[in-house]
Each structure stands twice: as structure tokens, then as C-alpha cells.
Amino acid sequence: MEPSHSNTGQSRSVDRKTVEKNRRMQMKSLYSELISLLPHHSSTEPLTLPDQLDEAANYIKKLQVNVEKKRERKRNLVATTTLEKLNSVGSSSVSSSVDVSVPRKLPKIEIQETGSIFHIFLVTSLEHKFMFCEIIRVLTEELGAEITHAGYSIVDDAVFHTLHCKVEEHDYGARSQIPERLEKIVNSVH
């Protein structure tokens, strides 16, 4: 009985060694992948693993700060643009204490045509976000457009949708109907 017990102990020891070896190989692979994502280090001498990890952590923190700055800049630009639009419509009585980050009269749509590509910008309130799905349905099912890009962003109570679609060059009838049909959908809410 004693010999079988020692074989089991050796087997467990080998299993642990194999597991540890696999773990080290996996960690080495993960470290390599992490370091490959960093901008190249200008130093000629290679960094130690702890230095590489510190550099990765610092780089991630720097990216987080940049993202937060860009979000703040976006919020400011949206507020500025909205204020300019409100003022250009003749709403000069807006006081500075009013939150202008969301346009007062929603939804709004802007359509730009570049050849057979339409760029559609839709701003809705959170309660009217269904309108985006309706616009996609009308474009694809009724007008035969092909959606090439769709996305949205939520800022405060506004949803900013962007949509790019392609209509065949020879299908002028559908192309001419797009602005009219989409504005009809948007204006049905007012």
C-alpha cells in the first residue's frame, strides 16, 4: 500500500508543477499582450516587468483622464451649440440659470446628402427615443435604403442619434422622399 501512496503523491506533485507551469506561461502571454498595447518605450534598455506594469498603469490612468476631459469638452460643446441654436431662433430671453444642455424643442432632425449617402442627425428626448427605430424602419422597409452606420449618445435628457444610409444612385424617387418622410415622422411628435 505504501508504494501506491507515494505514486499518488508524485502524481499530485507533477500535476501541481504542470498547473504552475501553465499558469506562468499564461501570465507571460498576458504580460506580453499588455505591453504590446502600450506606446513604444523610447529607452534602449528593456524595462523590468514591474516597470512595464507601472508604465501600463500610468498609461491607463492617462487615458482615463483624457477620456474624462473629452467628455467634459463634448458636454460644453453641446451646451454651447444648443445655446447658439436657441439664440438664433429668437429665444434671446433665455437666462443664464437655465440648463441649456438639451434643446427645448425636441425632437430635431438634420439630413445631409452626399451623393447616394445620407447623413442623418436626430436629437430626441429620452421619451421619444423610439423615433430612431421608426426612422430605420422607414428607411429600410419603405424606401429601400441600406444602413451603413447607426449610433447614439445620451447627454443629460437628450439622445443624439447618428445614422448613415446608402440609397442606389438610380433610385431618385426614394432619395427625394427621404427628407420629406423623416421630417414628417419627427414633426408628428410636435
Swiss-Prot record:
Keywords annotated in UniProt: DNA-binding, Nucleus, Transcription, Transcription regulation
Recorded GO MF terms: DNA binding; DNA-binding transcription factor activity; protein dimerization activity
Span of domain bHLH: 11-63
Annotated segments matching region Disordered: 1-21
Record's keyword annotation contains Manganese: no
Regions of compositional bias (Polar residues) in chain numbering: 1-12
Principal localisation: nucleus
Pfam families: HLH
TM spans (from-to): none
Localization of this protein: Nucleus
GO cellular component, one term: nucleus
Family of the protein in this entry: Belongs to the bHLH protein family.
Stated name of the protein: Transcription factor bHLH162
Source organism of the structure: Arabidopsis thaliana (Mouse-ear cress)
